[in-house]
Amino acid sequence: MSGCSRIAPFPAASTGNDLVSLEATRPERTTLPRFYSRILTAAEQEGYCPLEPYRLPFDHYVWLCWSVKEAVYKYQKRQIPELVFSPLRISIRQIVPPSGPDGFYQATVEGAPTPGPVRPPVEGAPSPANSPAAALYARSLIRDGVIVTTVCDNEAFAGTYWGFSSIDSPAYADQSAAVRTLLLGELKTVLSRDDLRLQKDPAGCPIVLAGDQPLAIPVSLAHHHRHIAYSYRLPDHAAQAQRSA
């Protein structure tokens, strides 16, 4: 996989994830209108139902939407470095409940707005490589008191991989170290190389380096309380090789 280091380090593709440890939230606060109205749009508030057949409590619904929006923000931040997180500017079109108790909640999200004025397209001009997707897709798993969400620009999640785990310590430094160790262990196996490391780009997004060379593998990290999660996006040729392995 050494050829990955020759790919341009700033691909249009991205990834975003988030994680919420429900035991570290306060349901009585989450269900106050003055709290959830800063997260849910009017349409999202009106669209809430117990999400049959599993009757998702309202506070869980709020944090599910938060998780989706945070993951969307992380996805878009890599493409639009100046983007500022604003939950009410990210609109969830719909959330489809899972077909079984261990399945995914699936959400469709309108493309996050770009900062500043939007210029009309010039006829015949190509779209910029880093323009936001018209829609993003989220898959969220709610299990063992944690919400884990991953976002992709294709509904099949082709080339996007993710994982999560629990840790013993809720300390921020331990969370941060553990999730990086978890992701690097996965990538070292997938890419068959041991010279990988993580650092942040100028916008604060994590990037993968092989030695000193940035790789075209977008990654996203999340941690909360005693839980950690990651997602990453492989280039098309690498994803195909991974599926064939």
Question: Which sequence ranges carry the predicted segments?
Answer:
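Core catalytic alpha/beta fold that binds nucleotide/phospho-ligands
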Residues: 1-245
